[in-house]
Amino acid sequence: QAHSAGVFGGNYGAIYEAARILNEFRVRLVGEPGLTFNPGFIAGGTTAVGDSTGYTFEVHGKTNIISPITVVKGDLRFQSEAQKERARGVMREIVAKHLPGTDASITFDDSYPAMPLTPGGATILAQYDSVSRALGYPAVRAQDANRRGAGDLSFVAPYIPGMDGLGALGGGGHS
């Protein structure tokens, strides 16, 4: 930690480094179809101590210090495992370059696998659409991957036909 008067000298600090990384993610990765990433929260300062869940942080600092620690947690969504690995490679490359006086690392925690539309899923979706229209309801089409969430079906979708992501978009914080 150092005094803020020297921030543009040899130590930019952890918050500037996190901002640089996030902006480079945006510049290099935005616009790839089916790929989204979102920094869900940032905690930075003199100290940033997480609880056992890793989602609640107690942060301390002052406005006149160069913050030595920043934690960013986010979400990465993708349409295929290959796309996931390409995005992670770009992210690792960005993180490996540092502003003077800084260091950074990135880790990834897998939760839900990718779930591209499979031929079996397309067949079931076509049947569902046919029934929907026969009952006088609107056509049912596959939604853009960027508008869908993760579903438990993604774990078995490579092995059995299925469809997911047809529910209402909802509202509030999880829409």
Segments predicted by a language model, with ranges:
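Metal-dependent amide/peptide-bond hydrolase catalytic core
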Residues: 1-175
